[in-house]
Amino acid sequence: MSVAVSPLAPKSYPDMPALRGVRMATAAAGIKYKNRTDVLLMVFDKPASVAGVFTKSKCPSAPVDFCRANLGSGAARAVVVNSGNANAFTGVKGKAATELTAKSAAAAVGCSEGEIFLASTGVIGEPLDASKFAGVLGDMNVRAEADFWQEAAKAIMTTDTYPKVSTRTAEIGGVIVTINGISKGAGMIAPDMATMLSFVVTDADIEPAALQSLLSAGVGPTFNSVTVDSDTSTSDTLMLFATGAAAEDGQVKVTSADDERLSSFRAALNDLLKDLALQVVRDGEGARKMVEVTVTGAENDAAAKKIALSIANSPLVKTAVAGEDANWGRVVMAVGKSGEMADRDRLAIWFGGVRVAVNGERDPDYSEAETTAVMRLEDITVKVDIGLGQGTATVWTCDLTKEYVAINGDYRS
């Protein structure tokens, strides 16, 4: 875990309210890190509705396979997360580790192994010794608390420099419900599902199918629109749980994602997902600047997003941002290599509110002083208009610094 907190970290953290129906505990198992917690147990007092989206990597981790197999039941009683070891590319040993963890968690909580969900993050390719923490899950269940969100977020960190938490409230049929979420991620971040690891819990009463629809729709403009280094993790897991405790306040169960009562909840959920996703980018390994890339005028929205990601993932664009150089030529390069339709002579490019290029050449009113002032900011916007259609998209990334190389060059040591 990095020592210095990212300069882009939040200046303050929200007060995370206790959420009815869920309790958490952490433990220090010494999986990779010393003198810190590295295991999280999240317990649902009653079966919670569950939804999930996972990595599209063709080399998924053993916990991802395990979660996918259990997701169809629609019910969760516990989640076990460890940091320091991804339990990915670990063969039969990896599967055995998930089975031991699930068996131990089920015994600790008093449920079936089909109601257990697992996630691991850390080094890929090294066997996970689940016996280091499987034996303490019973004790963790006993001491689990409802008001433990910050500590839960800390336990799942790897190269993160700060815990990522967020909370929102919404209304369903006149009943106020709460949504809390935690995330981890700083490297191996690219949009192809969700984020690295993220767990969101609400006390709303929503059936699993509706919950899944809400989550699947929410990841597109949020977690699927952020990138740090274009590398999609083998372990990406985003799960949404609904404890149903709001039924005690009179909330009538939601059975369909088309239910009009979900309007406020959907907006709050999407806002929380975006908040967590942007916190991940702000903690990008070695990051010193946050970059928002917006593409307009593409053939369609899908084309706009592909172009935006081509820009956001370009090492040359990202290093130019790190060097505070408004090098629009690199943006042009990234547009051209995206594989989408573009007309060089129609392109227009802005850094912040300063137009630097138009009609395929440098803006005749270009101001070096104005552009330099923009590039010195911590939060930078880049806008590109393709000039061909109505497609639009926005993605977020960070700069690429020497610290990123140092962090990843030393990661296994």
Swiss-Prot record:
The record marks T121, G122 as: Involved in the stabilization of negative charge on the oxyanion by the formation of the oxyanion hole. Substrate binds at T158, K184, T195, E285, N408, S413. SUPFAM superfamilies: DmpA/ArgJ-like. Keywords: Acyltransferase, Amino-acid biosynthesis, Arginine biosynthesis, Autocatalytic cleavage, Cytoplasm, Multifunctional enzyme, Transferase. GO terms for cellular component: cytoplasm. It holds the Pfam family ArgJ. One of its GO terms (molecular function) is L-glutamate N-acetyltransferase activity. Catalyzes two activities which are involved in the cyclic version of arginine biosynthesis: the synthesis of N-acetylglutamate from glutamate and acetyl-CoA as the acetyl donor, and of ornithine by transacetylation between N(2)-acetylornithine and glutamate. Heterotetramer of two alpha and two beta chains. Belongs to the ArgJ family. This is Arginine biosynthesis bifunctional protein ArgJ. It comes from Agrobacterium fabrum (strain C58 / ATCC 33970) (Agrobacterium tumefaciens (strain C58)). The lineage of its organism: Bacteria, Pseudomonadati, Pseudomonadota, Alphaproteobacteria, Hyphomicrobiales. The gene is argJ.
